[in-house]
Regions:
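Ligand-binding clefts of soluble mixed alpha/beta catalytic domains
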Residues: 2-538
Length: 538
C-alpha cells in the first residue's frame, strides 16, 4: 500500500490506555478526532495539489459546495488503511477513497457518496467496498435519494489489487443489487467530475440523471492505456470519453461548463421529485398566476406549415415562469423537460421544429427515459405535440429507429400517471399516434394550427393519385385541384365536428386549462404511490 504524505506522527506517550482510567476515555476521544483529521487530509498535500492543478475540486470541497452548510454527517470517517509500529501505535493512515454520509440538499435529506481521486485514483486497491455497499443499502432502507460524485474507478479493480492478493478473482459489482433496486425506489443522480472509468462509469449511468462537467469529467469503460493495448487506438482522455463523445449518444443527460454548475443541476433536478416512490412530488406555493394568458401564443405557430418556430418561448408561456428544467440534451428534436403548472411538477414532451419534428432513435431514447422517470416518481405527463412521425431514410433504419420508437411508445402506454396533450401542429403516423396514450381518457386540446393524419397530406397526394396525375391532360392543374379539395377536409374544424379532437382552443387558454387539469391529476396520484408496476432500467 502506498504511504500517503499525510503520515501520522506517533503521539507522545501511550497511544491509548488499556481501559478507563482517572481521565475516563479522553485519550480515545482524542484519538478518534486525530484519525478523523487524517482522513480529512485525503491523499495528502501533494496529491491534493495535483488534483487542483488538474482543475478539479477535491472530494471534501465538492461535498461542501453541494450540501447545505453544516449538514454533511460522514459515515465511516475512520475507514482506511493504517500502518502500526511494533508497539501498536498508528504511524500512518491512508483513508479509503470513498467518502459517504447523509446530507441535506436544499433542505432535503440525501445519501451523498463521493470518490476521492487523491487516494490511488479511486481504484480498488485503496477501497473498502463495505462502505460503498452500506451507503447504497442504507439509502434504500431509509428512502433517501442517492447522489454520487464520481471521479476515478469508484473502487474498481486494478492490477495492483491482484498482486497484493496473490491471486485473481471473479469480479462482483459491489452493492449492485441495491444499486438496481434503488432505481425503482429513490431518485438517483450521478455526476462525472473526473476520468470516470470501469465500475465508476457503470455507477454513473445507473441513475435517473447523469451530469458531466465538460472538460473536467470523462467517461469510458476502460481508460487510454487499456484501450491502447487492446485496440491500438492512441487517444487522450477527452478524445476517448469527453463531452464531445457523449453529447449525443444517450449516456449522459446534462452537460455543464463547471463542477459548480453541475451541482446546481443536481439541486434543481431533485426539487421536482419526491424523496421516494412512497411520496408525492413536492408542490410549491404558486408564484405564477394559473390564469395567465400569453398573447404571444396566438402567433407562436406560423401559418406556413414549412416555417419552423421556437419552442422555448412556448414552454415559458405555458408553464410556471422559470420552472422549465431541460432533461435529456441528446434527444435532438425531441424536447424532454420537467416543469411546474401552478406549482405542481410535471414531465414535458415537446418538439423543437428548428431541429426537425420526427422521432429519431436518440429522441425516442430521451422520451423513454423521461416517461419512465415520471411513472416511477408520479409526475403527470404533458405533451405539446408537433410530431411528424418516425425519422425515415437509410441512416434512420441503420440506427434501429423503429425499435427505439416502439420502446418509447410502450413506455407511454405502460405509464399509469395522468397524461394531457396540447396539439400545436403536426400529429402524423406511428410516432404521432404514440406521443400520448389516446386509448385512455386523457385530456387533449388542439390549437387551430393542428394538422394530422396517417401521413402528411401535402406529400401524400402525389403518391395516392399517381395514376390519375399521369393520365391527366394537365398534371399540374390536376394536382392543384386535388390540393384544394383535400385542403378543405384537413381543416381542424372538420375533425372537431366528429370529436376527432376533444376541443379546439384559443392558444392563450392553454395555461389556464392545464393548471386546472393538473390539480385534478394530483387528486388521483395518491392511488399510485408506491413502487412502479415494472422495475426502472438505466
Amino acid at each position: 500500500m502506498t504511504t500517503p504524505d499525510n503520515a501520522a506522527a506517533p503521539p507522545d506517550g501511550p497511544q491509548a490506555p488499556a481501559g478507563p482510567g482517572p481521565a475516563g476515555w479522553a485519550a480515545e476521544v482524542a484519538e478518534i478526532e486525530r484519525r478523523r483529521e487524517l482522513g480529512r487530509a485525503m491523499g495528502g498535500p501533494g496529491k491534493v495539489a495535483r488534483q487542483r492543478e488538474a482543475g478539479r475540486l477535491t472530494v471534501r470541497e465538492r461535498i461542501e459546495q453541494l450540501a447545505d452548510p453544516g449538514s454533511f454527517a460522514e459515515i465511516g470517517a475512520l475507514t482506511g488503511f493504517g500502518a502500526y509500529d511494533r508497539d501498536g501505535r498508528l504511524t500512518s493512515l491512508l483513508p479509503a477513497n470513498f467518502v459517504a454520509g447523509t446530507a441535506r440538499i436544499s433542505g432535503r435529506a440525501v445519501m451523498l457518496g463521493a470518490d476521492d481521486f487523491t487516494v490511488r485514483g479511486g481504484s480498488g486497491d485503496a477501497a473498502i467496498h463495505a462502505k460503498q455497499v452500506f451507503s447504497e443499502e442504507y439509502a434504500g432502507q431509509m428512502r433517501l435519494p442517492v447522489v454520487r460524485l464520481l471521479d476515478g474507478q469508484s473502487g474498481g479493480g486494478s492490477v495492483k489489487m491482484a498482486l497484493r492478493a496473490g491471486a485473481t478473482y471473479v469480479p462482483v459489482n459491489p452493492a449492485w443489487d441495491a444499486v438496481i433496486d434503488n432505481l425503482s425506489l429513490v431518485p438517483v443522480v450521478a455526476a462525472c467530475l473526473g476520468p470516470t472509468v470501469g465500475l465508476g462509469a457503470a455507477r454513473l449511468v445507473m441513475s435517473h440523471l447523469a451530469v458531466m462537467a465538460a472538460g473536467v469529467g470523462q467517461l469510458f469503460t476502460a481508460g487510454p492505456p487499456v484501450v491502447r493495448g487492446g485496440t491500438g487506438e492512441d487517444l487522450t482522455k477527452e478524445e476517448l470519453g469527453g463531452a464531445a463523445v457523449h453529447r449525443r449518444n444517450g449516456t449522459i443527460e446534462r452537460f455543464t461548463a463547471t463542477e459548480e454548475e453541475a451541482f446546481a443541476v443536481i439541486r434543481a433536478f431533485l426539487s421536482y421529485l419526491p424523496g421516494s416512490v412512497h411520496e408525492l412530488p413536492p408542490v410549491l406555493a404558486g408564484a405564477d398566476d394559473p390564469g395567465r394568458r400569453e398573447e404571444s401564443l396566438v402567433t407562436a405557430v406560423p401559418r406556413d406549415p414549412r416555417q419552423p418556430y421556437r419552442i422555448a418561448p412556448v414552454l415559458e408561456a405555458i408553464f410556471d415562469r422559470g420552472s422549465v428544467f431541460p432533461y435529456a440534451e441528446y434527444g435532438g428534436s425531441m424536447v424532454t423537460a420537467l416543469a411546474r403548472l401552478d406549482g405542481h411538477p410535471v414531465g414535458v414532451l415537446a418538439t423543437d421544429p428548428y431541429r426537425g419534428t420526427t422521432m429519431s432513435a436518440q429522441g425516442a431514447q430521451a422520451m423513454t427515459r423521461l416517461v419512465d422517470l415520471c411513472e416511477t416518481f408520479h409526475l403527470p405527463i404533458v405533451s405539446l405535440t408537433d410530431q411528424g412521425g418516425m425519422t425515415v431514410g437509410r441512416v434512420a433504419e441503420e440506427r434501429g429507429t423503429i425499435r427505439f420508437g416502439a420502446r418509447a411508445i410502450t413506455a407511454i402506454y405502460q405509464a399509469r400517471v395522468p397524461q394531457a396533450e396540447l396539439i400545436l401542429r403536426r400529429v402524423y403516423g406511428v410516432g404521432g399516434a404514440g406521443i400520448v396514450n389516446r386509448h385512455r381518457a386523457a385530456r387533449s386540446w388542439a390549437w387551430p394550427s393542428g394538422d394530422w393524419g396517417s401521413l402528411p397530406m401535402r406529400g401524400g397526394i402525389e403518391a395516392a393519385f399517381r395514376a390519375e396525375l399521369e393520365q391527366a391532360a394537365d398534371p399540374a392543374a390536376e394536382l392543384e385541384r386535388l390540393r384544394r379539395e383535400l385542403g378543405a377536409i384537413t381543416s381542424p374544424f372538420r375533425t372537431a365536428e366528429r370529436f376527432g379532437v376533444q376541443d379546439l382552443i384559443d392558444p392563450r387558454d392553454s395555461r389556464p386549462l392545464l393548471c386546472a387539469w393538473v390539480r385534478d391529476a394530483y387528486r388521483v396520484l395518491p392511488e399510485q404511490v408506491g413502487r412502479p408496476a415494472f422495475g426502472t432500467r438505466p
